[in-house]
Structures are given as C-alpha cells and as structure tokens.
Amino acid sequence: MKKLVIFETNNKDGIMSRSKKFYPDTYSEEDIKQDFLKVRQKVGEKYGFSGLKILQPAQKDVEANLDYPDGTYKRIDDTCLLKEDLWYETIPADILVIDSNYQNIVIGHRAADCPVIIAEDRKKQVVAVSHSGALQINRKVPMYTISALQKEAGSNLNDIYVYIGSCIKKSSYVYDRYPNWATNVSVWENCIEKKENLYHIDLVTAIINQLNIPKDHITISPVDTYKNQDYYSHLSEVKKESKPIGQNFVGAFNKER
C-alpha cells in the first residue's frame, strides 16, 4: 500500500533555486550547482527520497521563452526520468501528474510567496501538482489541476483532496492600486478587497473557488510566508527587508507505507 508524503522547505533547509541573485557574487555557476545539490540532498535525507529525484514543471509565467496552451499537463512516465539529476529535466507545462507506480519521485515547485497546490485522488492514487500564484490563478491553473486528474484518471471530485501550501496571505498581499494582472474579473470577484485605498489580495480563496471539491477536502497551510521569519518571501526581498532571500519548495512523493 502506498502513501503520499507532502512536504515543504523553508530557509532553515536552504535555498531551493539556482538563481544567481541568491548566492554570493563570487560564486561561479559550478559553485551554485554544488551548493544547490547539497541542499537538495539534505532535504531528501530529511524526508526520505533522493535529492536527485525532484521534478517540477517549466511554467510559462516563470521560465523564459516558453509557450503552451493554458492548463497543459504532463503525466510522469519513464521518458521523464532519464537524467541522473531530474532537476535539470525541462517539462513545459502548468501541471505535473504522477501515479503510485512511481515511488520516491518528487513532483513540486519552488516558490517564495506563491501557493503551490497538491491535488490527490486518494481512491485512484494519482496526484497533480501546480504552482498557482496570482498569474496562474488568473488563467485558472487551479481549475486545470483538478481537470488534469479527471482527464488522466477519470477522477471523481468527491475523491480529490487538495493541499494549499504556505504562501502570502490576504493581510500581507497589498497593492496601492488594482493589480494590472487581474484581468479575469470573475476569478477575482470577492478576492480583491479595497480597504482605505489599498487592495488586499486573497490568493487562497481565489484558488478554492476554482477547485469545485468538498470544502472539507481542502487543507490550507496557515503559514504566511511574508510574516513568518522561517520562510523565504519575494515581497520581503522586493522591500529589501532583513529576511534571507531565496526560494522555498512544496512537493509530494509516493512511498510504501
């Protein structure tokens, strides 16, 4: 019998990114590569998988020079597992899907304020993962994440459970004007609230509105990545606050019970 393990990293674990801006100016690309591998190996030892066995989608809002239809997903198969270090596997998609035949292969995404959602069909033991920040919510990636399970596994909505990872919460995510990325009006209805000339953005509710599954099947991390000193936060980085800069990771993998 398999079980799904869901985990998150934070700044206590180390930087889950190869972006040069997170490392000392003196670091070469090889220095970054080696430091990053050590972090992944340490995380793998902590949770019980190989740090070389982590896959994430190459998302068009996140990576450069990518395009594909909204909601594109990839079901993990043997062709995705050919490289020794799977972090360097490029899979252009919004969503990754994996079944319980693939054990100890992590699917997830790095993030530093954006929610990552993990949707599990517990009956059919199939899992879908997507990075669902504001841009992705605007183009309905959470909805497509559920749809990927329905298309790939014939999932019943009543069998799907969702985890919404640690992210910036409404009290912290504030604009002084209506955000120009919020172009899909129906998506943001009642999720962007104006208070005293400031706009408070509720990413979590906007995600939940797209899932269409029983509310008691949804687990939400209580962590606000901006306020919690243990988590990397993009907003904190932009504001040049005192927190360390970097990226967290939210992922899931199957293992034997």
Predicted regions and their residues:
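Active-site microenvironment for binding and transforming phosphate-containing groups
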Residues: 1-257
